[in-house]
Amino acid sequence: MQVSDKGLIALISHEGIVPGPYYDSVGVLTAYIGHTKAAGPPDPATLPWGMPSDLDKAIKEAFRVFKQDIKKYEAEVIKAFKKPLTQNEFDAAVSFHYNTGKIHSAAWVRTFNSGNRAAAIEQIMNWTKPIEVTARRQAEQTLFSLGIYPKTSLTVWQVSPSRKVIWKPAKVLTTEEALKLLEDETPLSVKEGEKKTTTVTPTPTPASVLPLILSSLFKFLGGRK
């Protein structure tokens, strides 16, 4: 099972897009679309500080890393739930896990697995620390229970050399642009021309040369008196 397009867009909207490393609300060094060292490479500590010189390239890299990360979280959510999930439930659960990393220890998941869906939905709101995530938890709770996806804004935020988010848009993506970035599987190195396609002219084989030889011979013989 995979997160739907609507689920991915909602998750990206919750996380925000930051084209360089920054400290989140609890002091974890983060980059791109909520990417941390715990999720795997690249380590945000190794990325250049501040705004990149090529913003579009950084955005493409952010989406590449996000696609890499989301597979890990999808697999862990599938493993944590013992009962079937609808698409909206799965999308909400992956969003929760992407933010908290605690799908295996969350009480609401155990409650859901025991068969008490209503109580599980209520318990989602036990995860509201820091307070900044309260609105996100409410949106995930609504998505899980009612299948209503939140209205989204896909903002690329500015970031300072001191690794702080500057809440001024550097760019705003449309849903269509974001989905295209998610679908694009072409490595950046290919796009940037690091790998070029070389056209090789085939060497004529004897079979392909023979008609030319015969044609020339007939013309020669036909022209003799």
Model-derived regions, located:
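Substrate-binding/active-site groove segments that recognize
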Residues: 23-49
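Structural recognition of the beta-strand scaffold that forms the well-ordered cores
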Residues: 30-32, 92-97, 120-123
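Short, conserved, surface-exposed binding loops centered on an aromatic residue
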Residues: 21-23, 84-85
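Long, amphipathic alpha-helical surface segments
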Residues: 1-9, 14-20, 26, 35-38, ...
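Alpha-helical segment that forms one wall of the substrate-binding/catalytic cleft
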Residues: 45-82, 87-105, 109
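Short runs of predominantly hydrophobic/aromatic residues within well-ordered alpha helices
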Residues: 28, 87-90, 117
